Amino acid sequence: TGARAAEASYTEGKGSGIEKIDITSNKNGKQVSIVNGTMVFLYYESILQDATHAVVSYSDSGNSVGSGDNPKKFTSITEGLPLVGQETVNIKVQDNNQNALEMTLYVNKVNPLTEDTRKQVVQLQLASREFIMNEKVRVNTRFDGKISDHIKKLLEDKKYLGPTEKSEEKEGFKAKKIDIEPTENTYNFVGNNKKPYYLINWLSRGAVPKLPEGGGGTGISAGFLFWETNKGLHFKSIDTLLGQNPKLSVLYNESPDENELPPEGYDVKALEYSVSNAVDIQQKLKLGAYSTRLIVFNPFNTFYEVI
């Protein structure tokens, strides 16, 4: 097992690259590729982040897009497309292990970095569709039932973050895979004009995972996490995530290896590490680090329970 892990860890990398970055105008459907002018491409996804993000910096010489009705007149992408925000960006990249990532993101911010008489360098901050839609939607309806059902409704219902029109499919958007772990407890609430992401993160703190044998689920729970990856949207309990088998064994021992393989029983060796051990009791108490409880009250029948 250790030999196979070591062999997999040291697979020879191959060439990586950006295959496609196409921007589509919101105004007239005009499309332009910036793949040849791209200087920097950064893609971010994290288990602690609600949405995926990317940053693209490209150089524009000013002869990129046709200007107006004159086919012989060209101008910069910023002016000719034009870039005003929320443009659709279809991206395809490939890493050193030949893993291809295809995604559709949207322009969240346009930052002109430098500009002179010869060229313009522009940075685009991109975000997923759900990140943009979250700022447009407010939840005012009442929700009854299990917390996992509430999460599913917020992510799939057309009134909230779900796909709305077939026109989005023409832009390259595809409905994302929704990976939701069932919860044991129920919770009824009213949206109170909150954003979907706010409600999802709020509900995740009180969610209790459903036990496989169905024998409970109202005990101590560390809560749930909500995050997005290139593969979809995920809502998983911390207990389930930490209960999995290790995906990677890492060793840090401050000593050089006699050969190129990691030590027996480990997959890789860490070059350096740092520890964050800032202790703030007041802040931890505010967040409920040492004691949490869920109070359930039904005003119609005066039912009261502390979980």
Short names for language-model regions:
Residues 121, 128-130, 174-287, 292, ...:
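Short beta-strand-centered interaction patches in the first periplasmic/extracellular domains
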Residues 1-136:
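Assembly/oligomerization scaffold segments
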Residues 44-80, 259-307:
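An acidic/polar, Gly/Ser/Thr-rich interaction patch typically located in mid-to-C-terminal regions
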Residues 133-142, 154-157, 177, 203:
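Subunit-assembly interface segments of extracellular/virion macromolecular structures
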Residues 148-152, 197-200:
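Extracytoplasmic/secreted envelope proteins and their assembly/folding machinery
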Residues 135-145, 185-191:
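Second-shell loop/turn segments in exported
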Residues 151-190:
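N-terminal export/assembly leaders
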